[in-house]
């Protein structure tokens, strides 16, 4: 975590449980990020928190630190049964749930509190086996959580701490009824510590906080630009015919160490993957159609650096904690203004710099005015020379289901192509 991203406030300055402080310092966390410095005084005093912060600013560690401290400082209810977790974290996607679980593991190891995962699409029996052994903290997506609850594999009657992460995304994905169903199975709001975190605190998110929390304190950490001042933004206006060639030319020019390319549909993502894989790039595909085990494998390969490029739909736009993403390409301008912010927020995280390149084609250029109004500034426009676009491109690979595979390893040096001045 970059020092420029941190405050002078140290975790050791708070009256945190010693085991929590020890675990944080062992992982190299000494100073708080702004959202952590704002949230911890409130949660340590037992106050509910609804927090807004740009992605990559330490929201996850803010609620995990608060949760572990609370559970260590407050006894579990008497005669708690093995199927009753003490804390629940709800996440909108499987990937985010898995990432939160990974972030929580060092704290769990240091404190002895047990973790459980519950997400759909994979591992029903494996997850259930862990739950049946008893967990203190359950992390999951709403559909699988409800499934286990209806089967009496879990009972939420002993919940002492609850976290709703990426609350705005929960609304976008249509999970609000599931969330309310789960809340109704918990003790009343004034008998638990409640935390909600979101990239935006819209009216509907605040309404949810009012319904399900106990007089929550609202905290916000937002840069002057919604997109973050460390992200260089750039916009091109290609024709539909030149769009793919422009993307491939830009990739050859930029030769990014680690890039994510976003498109608006899974079919467009598959098309992009086919072109890049055929051209020798180490590229992975992440859409809703990709099987869970392969999704996790692809994310792991991308995080390790075995893949240079990830092509993704907005299912992957939030909650991905991938370090050192250097470039984000918006192959399609998103229909939702907030998705633009979340997409390019994959780069320039935790104080690092990043580069976002957007293609405003004939089909999606109409989304640009609303995006620029939302972010509060115009995206700088760059020109390109159509005659300098790559032409020596191989025939794209076709995706054979259920394969989601990776392209061949990137070889050689980037080809030299120049933009117009």
UniProtKB/Swiss-Prot annotation:
Catalytic activity: ATP + H2O = ADP + phosphate + H(+)
Localisation: Cytoplasm
Naturally occurring in which organism (per UniProt): Shigella dysenteriae serotype 1 (strain Sd197)
Gene Ontology, cellular component aspect: cytosol
Pfam families: DEAD (PF00270), Helicase_C (PF00271)
Domain Helicase C-terminal span(s) in chain numbering: 245-390
Gene3D superfamilies, sorted: P-loop containing nucleotide triphosphate hydrolases (3.40.50.300)
Motif segment (Q motif): 9-37
UniProt keyword RNA-binding present: yes
An example Gene Ontology biological process: RNA catabolic process
Helicase ATP-binding domain sequence ranges: 40-219
Motif residue range(s): DEAD box: 165-168
Positions of the UniProt region annotated as Disordered: 392-421
Protein name listed in UniProt: ATP-dependent RNA helicase RhlB
Molecular function (Gene Ontology), one example: RNA helicase activity
Function: DEAD-box RNA helicase involved in RNA degradation. Has RNA-dependent ATPase activity and unwinds double-stranded RNA.
Binding positions for ATP per the UniProt entry: 53-60
Keyword line: ATP-binding, Cytoplasm, Helicase, Hydrolase, Nucleotide-binding, RNA-binding
E.C. numbers: 3.6.4.13
